[in-house]
Amino acid sequence: MRALNNSYDVVVVGAGPAGSMASYNASKNGAKTLLLEKSQEIGTPVRCAEAVPRLEDFGINPDPSFVRSYIKGGYLIAPNGKQVVVKGGKTDGYVVERKVFDKYLAIRSGQAGTQIAVKSRVTGIEKTDDGYNVFVNYLGDEYIVKTKIVIAADGVESNIAEYAGLKSKKSHKEICSCAEYEMTNVKLLDNEMMEFYFGDICPKGYIWLFPKGDTVNVGIGIIDSKKRAIDYLDEFLTNPLVKGRLDNAVPVEFKVGGDPVGGPIEKTVADNIMVVGDAAGHVSPLTGGGIGLSMSCGLMAGDVAAQSIKAEDHSREFLSAYEKRWKEKYYKPLMKDLKYKTILQKLSDEELNAIADSIPENLEEVDVGKLAVKIVAKAPSLLRHFKELI
């Protein structure tokens, strides 16, 4: 059981949501698939706020073993405390226990036929005439695994895409630094609603409170700041905006990480290789959210990989079907979010307050173009920021 085989149709590197969904779909459609995970336990370390979209859309039952809270919307809170409620439409979802959820996705992949190897570090890949040699340190032993297709799902610090000549590394200005406490004894505005705080308290980012059953994820994401994310987060815990609600809060876990928020990478396919998930920039530049997007793109990559094996064609041209599919569905929304992020980062606290005062207090969805018209009508001085959206 410990030993790896000499060859596979598909090798997926990284057992996060993108990698597990890719390997699941590849195996389900007949490809001999290996899923490699560098950690000794799938799902650790946890690096994010753990919010996911409707799992039913992926054919996944929201099992109580990993679902901690149902989410029906969120509060957008301006520096002056003005609250805008976003509720209904596509805002519902779940907060999950990532340690359990990620492992569930991997188990699902294993049940579809994937071989899984934890504590497996890929030290390099080498192009061959018909695929790649993948160099793996698995539980201390060295292996060379031959494969026809590599799927790089190895996260924001992806090396696999770089080995293959596909640029995936981001500059520090494209990485959102995140810090988060999981805390008990937190009083939320609503136990089924997320809370988002903006302004100078979290430069070029936001602070979040996400309900998680008996606990709450209290976190921050910032970009290119003079201080550490944890410093801003600690200051927020005593901010008047949350006065009386975090006074008795007790941390039970602390997490740090980075989110790629510079938009998707230019090329996600080459001969015998595809890139997916954080490694591909499959993350909203505006919100930093990417679990659902990565799961969806992972399914696409796994499907195309299996088709490629059946067709005995692993060329860039054939694998480009994957890139075409994810770009048709997600590229424009991601680029819009990148534009919105750029605008948001330029706004002062006074301008954020003016925006909150200019839009309805209750929204079913966030249509930025329509909101921009209302904002400028009530606060003409903001036209310089929003003229591209009107």
Swiss-Prot record:
Pfam families: FAD_oxidored, GGR_cat. It catalyses: a 2,3-bis-O-phytanyl-sn-glycerol 1-phospholipid + 8 A = a 2,3-bis-O-(geranylgeranyl)-sn-glycerol 1-phospholipid + 8 AH2; 2,3-bis-O-(phytanyl)-sn-glycerol 1-phosphate + 8 A = 2,3-bis-O-(geranylgeranyl)-sn-glycerol 1-phosphate + 8 AH2; CDP-2,3-bis-O-(geranylgeranyl)-sn-glycerol + 8 AH2 = CDP-2,3-bis-O-(phytanyl)-sn-glycerol + 8 A; archaetidylserine + 8 AH2 = 2,3-bis-O-phytanyl-sn-glycero-3-phospho-L-serine + 8 A. It is an enzyme of class 1 (oxidoreductase). A 2,3-bis-O-(geranylgeranyl)-sn-glycerol 1-phospholipid binds at V368. Keywords: FAD, Flavoprotein, Lipid biosynthesis, Lipid metabolism, Oxidoreductase, Phospholipid biosynthesis, Phospholipid metabolism. Pathway: Membrane lipid metabolism; glycerophospholipid metabolism. Gene3D superfamilies: D-Amino Acid Oxidase, subunit A, domain 2, FAD/NAD(P)-binding domain. GO terms for molecular function: flavin adenine dinucleotide binding; geranylgeranyl reductase activity; oxidoreductase activity, acting on the CH-CH group of donors, NAD or NADP as acceptor. Its cofactor is FAD. FAD binds at A18, E37, C48, A49, A51, R98, V122, D278, G290, I291. GO terms for biological process: glycerophospholipid biosynthetic process; membrane lipid biosynthetic process. It comes from the Archaea. The keyword Lipid metabolism applies. InterPro entries: DGGGPL_reductase, FAD/NAD-bd_sf, Geranylgeranyl_Rdtase_fam, Geranylgeranyl_reductase, GGR_cat. Its EC number is 1.3.-.-. Is involved in the reduction of 2,3-digeranylgeranylglycerophospholipids (unsaturated archaeols) into 2,3-diphytanylglycerophospholipids (saturated archaeols) in the biosynthesis of archaeal membrane lipids. Catalyzes the formation of archaetidic acid (2,3-di-O-phytanyl-sn-glyceryl phosphate) from 2,3-di-O-geranylgeranylglyceryl phosphate (DGGGP) via the hydrogenation of each double bond of the isoprenoid chains. Belongs to the geranylgeranyl reductase family. DGGGPL reductase subfamily. Reduction reaction proceeds via syn addition of hydrogen for double bonds. This is Digeranylgeranylglycerophospholipid reductase. It comes from Methanococcus maripaludis (strain C5 / ATCC BAA-1333).
